[in-house]
Swiss-Prot record:
SUPFAM superfamilies: PP2C-like. This is Probable protein phosphatase 2C 61. Binds 2 magnesium or manganese ions per subunit. One of its GO terms (molecular function) is metal ion binding. One of its GO terms (biological process) is regulation of intracellular signal transduction. SMART domains: PP2Cc.
Length: 377
């Protein structure tokens, strides 16, 4: 099964002397190479990411958790296997329908897991996760998103320069468009989005309108659980006529063009709150080597976070996990290079199964960066 391919992680390197950073410098995939990196800010890492490479396809997942690590860790273990299951029903081909079914099935599985496990998993009932998926199948790239992680393409423009093109749709209620959409879906609820603690929030609690998990915003049965109320006191006041958060992803498909579509940056919002789309694309395109490029993105974001708080980057390294969350969020970045040939993809003609158990490999970020380097933690 695919689940066993997605355990562990490739040989890691500390990001400088910072025990809260990690990277996998460069690894091959079906249509090129990829680089991964992460930086931990929370007491327990809430971001997760993974890349599965097989001869016929490449899958990229970035899962930005909130309210604890449970939902993002669940996605790390279940999303790729679900894609495999639904793709197998269609002869092995991945497409938008397969991806949508996998998102919704993952959300339902998480809900059922909690129903079976309460009160032992009450902490997990307060957890949710944004979910960003990239799937390269032949010469087509699918990008699916629920939440506010982001995928940005580095594309060669007519004049030869590399420009940024955003590929994902975000669902953060900081956007007036997202707030209007949510209000239209809930015309009888004047408090479906409120401004609380300095930001717009769904029911005054979370900032995203789409996510996996956050079950207390989808069904009233969990808000009544005493343990859930202890973990998320605001849940007790939530009145639900219907779910106010959904796992429905926004999905975009793109035919890849050789020599034009160069690379894609997949990252959690911890990166994007400090780097613009254009800044990230320029950093990647101007790097002298691909090796370690994701770590350079993460370091650039950390440098900007330090600058905003008027501290030196070296001082930021000495701030412990948990406390560091006051300076930046967990940050995860995956840079996927697209080495395409003239007919659309180095292996575009291989349109067999999405995955092959004999030749697939899966790379993950660590469950917890601090614990990776501190085995007694």
């Amino acid at each position: 099964m695919m689940a066993r391919w997605c355990v562990g992680w490739p040989a890691a390197a500390r990001g400088g002397r910072d025990e809260l950073t990690w990277q996998a410098e460069l690894t091959a995939h079906a249509a090129g190479e990829f680089s991964m990196a992460a930086a931990q800010a929370n007491a327990v890492m809430e971001d997760q990411a993974q890349v599965m490479a097989s001869p016929g396809a490449t899958l990229v997942g970035v899962y930005d958790g909130h309210g604890g690590p449970d939902a993002s860790r669940f996605l790390r273990s279940r999303l790729f296997p679900l894609i495999h299951e639904f793709a197998a029903e269609r002869g092995g081909a991945v497409d938008a329908d397969v991806i949508r079914k996998a998102f919704l099935a993952a959300d339902e599985e998480y809900l059922q897991l909690l129903r079976w496990s309460l009160p032992n998993m009450s902490r997990a009932a307060a957890s949710g996760s944004c979910c960003l998926l990239g799937a390269i199948s032949g010469d087509t790239l699918y990008v699916a998103n629920a939440g506010d992680s982001r995928a940005v393409l580095g594309r060669r423009a007519a004049a030869g320069q590399t420009v940024a093109e955003r590929l994902s749709t975000e669902h953060n209620v900081a956007s007036e468009e997202v707030r209007r959409e949510l209000a239209a879906l809930h015309p009888d609820d004047g408090e479906v989005v409120v401004h609380a603690r300095g930001a717009w929030r769904v029911k005054g609690i979370i900032q995203v309108a789409r996510a996996i998990g956050d079950v207390y915003l989808k069904t009233p049965e969990f808000k009544r659980d005493p343990a859930v109320q202890r973990l998320c006191s605001a849940a007790a006041a939530v009145e639900l006529a219907r779910p106010v958060v959904t796992a429905e992803p926004s999905i975009h498909a793109r035919k890849l063009k050789a020599g034009v579509d160069l690379f894609v940056v997949f990252a959690s919002d911890g990166l994007w709150e400090h780097l613009s789309d254009e800044a990230a694309v320029q950093l990647v395109s101007k790097s002298s080597t691909r090796r370690g490029v994701a770590a350079r993105l993460v370091q650039a974001a950390l440098g900007e976070a330090a600058r905003k708080r008027e501290v030196r980057r070296g001082d930021l390294r000495r701030i412990e996990r948990g406390v560091r969350r006051h300076f930046h969020d967990d940050i995860t970045a995956v840079v996927v290079f697209l080495d395409l040939d003239d007919d659309g993809g180095r292996r575009a003609r291989r349109r067999g199964r999405v995955v092959d158990s004999s030749s697939s490999s899966c790379s993950n970020t660590p469950l917890d960066v601090y614990s990776l380097y501190n085995s007694t933690a």
